Amino acid sequence: MHAKRIFRACLLVLAATIGWQSPSVAGTAKGEDQQHAFDFHFGTWKTEIKSRDVTPSSVGEWVKFNGTVIDQPLWNGKANLEKIEASGPGGHFQGLTLFLYDPRSGQWSEQFAGSDDGTMQEPTYGEFKDGRGVFHGWTESGGKKVLERDIWSNITPDSYHYEIASSFDGGKTWVTNFVAQLTRLKKAPDYDTHYTPGTGPEHDFDFNMGRWSTRIQAVPHPLSSPAAKSSLGGTHEAYRVWDDWANIGQLEVDGPGGHRIEDLALRLYDRKTRQWRVYLANSTSGTLDAPVVGEFKDGVGTFVGMDEVDGKAVLTRNVWSDITAKSCRQDWAISTDGGRTWVSTWTSTDSRGG
């Protein structure tokens, strides 16, 4: 994880911690309880789907799918991760959706990725009111940006309805393109993920699965005070979401003042480019950063992206090295000169266990 994100989380950490609540119908979500609006969604569900292609000039026929949705809480309910797998006349697909709660706005974001390219789609944003969740954002249709609306409704402890619609006239009218009716199978999510051992690049992060203790040297202000470091400690746990294209790492760190800092890294494999995209978020901001992108070569993983430090746009680089069965190392650095020189911002050493 990146030092800047950790210390941003330290600055934004809530003055009071809101405790976890048992699953409840979303109609009770208001004020601070909005962060528990998705508690009803935790568990394992049967889904019946119908989907169709919609463009400004045509509306396709409905295609039906049947499958399973598994949703698990993260960060004590301030985030959740949904897995979906379904089959039908239109084929078979796997996907995941990450939901993040932003305590500053009191809203949720929703972002989907499919197994075909391992790329998070643009988010929709919204909240729940009177038992109904309404989210808005952008999507693409016919190569053009159009408005998208997602609605969660008819929510009971054992069922709910979900649909997606597009608007080609700025929100005046909407055309539904995706409908799902879900029925609960289990209150608890099925955490077990089928695993097929392999040596291809889609298995590059297999070494990291499990629980680790981590020691961190972080540089809070790498541009103005690159030599000033802070020592942090915590735990890092990684597990598979889908066998060969998605996994997640969660980091918990004891931050300043005894506050617990929670970060996650969602790692998605692109089968076409044979690269990984790593998306980062923390529970204090509740937003998903643009990914760092890269691959492993000769036992070293290198990932590069863009970031902002002290108001400046910079390159950021994440390197995994010294990988063994019981330990590994991560180095983060930034560059203000296009990658010619790098300033260290973060070094972590992980040991299995913790």
Give short role names for the model-derived ranges.
Residues 4, 15-16, 26, 314:
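A detector of low-complexity, intrinsically disordered, Ser/Thr/Gly/Pro/Ala-rich segments
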Residues 25-354:
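Hydrophobic small-molecule pocket/channel-lining residues, especially in calycin-type beta-barrels
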Residues 2-10:
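Bacterial N-terminal signal peptides that target proteins for export
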Residues 9-19:
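Bacterial N-terminal signal peptides
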Residues 21-23:
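N-terminal twin-arginine translocation
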